[in-house]
């Protein structure tokens, strides 16, 4: 806590290079982060005089992303704060109301898992969600598929299992109630879906003796990410041209970025 309290952001500078191949433009950040502005400006000038960028390495790999676990109360509150700007108390109050309306399981849970016997009821709950407008199409697509069991663990279920929707479909809900219900229902669909499969390309470039890096990813199979269709936080989603080690690309531009160090929350 004291470290957080005494944390002072520090300025640093990074170079952002633009290059292109086959009319596909992309940007790459310098591997170096400069504590002082002048060395960064000096490097900027050297790069401006260069006309080409060399491709040093190109690495491609397939990345599998397992779906997130089901919500416990704390993770629901965090998500509702991030996505809906709801306070923790407001989220709990709405979840309590949904529970009293027999629409979701007991909200004051510290577990993100369900037991095997509850898992056996999940297919029936998913069939119910086929009638819910926002998720109907996705839920119907899960019919007959093997469900992901990452959130199923009898040993990790505490007094109450993770948050899931019940067999009762909502009739009328206020907007805030609907928002929380859809977070829980959507997470339930995500948790029991297939993994997301991506092709990730990492490229290292060199210009005037300075190294630059860029990542791009192409989703091969969206899996659980198709529920909300949201991009991953901080995801490198650059559209990259096909590059090979040793390629020489024309330099399109270079700029200096001023940034601040930030505190990492764990």
What are these regions (language model features)?
Residues 1-264:
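Core catalytic DNA strand-manipulation module of type IA topoisomerases
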């Amino acid at each position: 806590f004291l470290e957080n309290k005494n944390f002072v952001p520090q300025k640093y500078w990074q170079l952002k290079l633009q290059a292109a191949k086959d009319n596909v433009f992309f940007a790459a950040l310098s591997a170096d982060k400069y504590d002082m502005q002048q060395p960064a400006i000096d490097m900027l000038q050297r790069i401006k005089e260069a006309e080409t960028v060399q491709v040093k390495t190109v690495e491609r790999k397939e990345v599998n992303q397992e779906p997130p676990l089901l919500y416990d109360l704390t993770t629901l509150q965090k998500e509702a704060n991030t996505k809906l700007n709801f306070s923790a108390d407001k989220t709990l109050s709405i979840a309590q109301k949904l529970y009293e309306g027999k629409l979701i399981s007991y909200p004051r849970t510290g577990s993100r898992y369900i037991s095997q016997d509850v898992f056996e009821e999940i297919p029936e709950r998913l069939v119910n969600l086929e009638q819910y407008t926002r998720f109907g199409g996705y839920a119907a697509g899960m019919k007959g598929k093997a469900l992901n069991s990452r959130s199923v663990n009898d040993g990790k279920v505490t007094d109450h299992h993770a948050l899931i929707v019940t067999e009762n479909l909502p009739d009328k809900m206020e907007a805030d109630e609907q928002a929380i219900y859809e977070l829980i229902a959507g997470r339930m669909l995500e948790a029991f879906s297939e993994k997301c499969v991506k092709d990730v390309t990492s490229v290292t470039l060199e210009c005037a003796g300075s190294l630059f890096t860029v990542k791009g990813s192409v989703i091969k199979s969206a899996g659980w990410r198709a529920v909300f269709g949201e991009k991953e936080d901080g995801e490198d989603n650059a559209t990259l041209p096909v590059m090979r080690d040793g390629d020489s690309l024309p330099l399109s531009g270079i700029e200096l970025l001023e940034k601040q160090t930030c505190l990492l929350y764990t």
